[in-house]
């Protein structure tokens, strides 16, 4: 079964790998472990955005090192980048001060990843690029794209992998209702599916702080 993987990069990061030693994740090994053997992984599409490094100048360096590691080690890997937008917003204070009820702060938002993922999921269905699509996210904004695939391509299968390293927690009901199967990406799989510290045939190394 031709299977394409669609990864919501920031949902994966915040749901499963942030604060863990498992950031050097081998995507192909991960889905080979999670999925049954009849799945032939033909593409791994990763939707994310480049971090700014405003708070940590080395953060974009580590991120790009990881991207290069995946590109060098995984022929099926494809990278699709959205953007970060920072703009001032004015919000009410939770505990107003005398003469001050509002504060203006800088708000940073990631734009494009969920839309890009949804567009690729639908377009690939129309192009007959997969028999099964596996969505790695718990973002309910993707529900409509999944619903349309089910409606217009009833022979195609949809899987949902929700990133959750701890036991407990639940997949989005809006997403799971459109999935033929639902899997959890937990700490055991994360620990077992790390890239080599040095990518063979390259000079790419796992960042020391990871």
Protein language model features and the residues they cover:
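Domain-level signal for Mg2+-assisted phosphodiester chemistry and nucleotide/NA-binding surfaces
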Residues: 1-108, 161-167
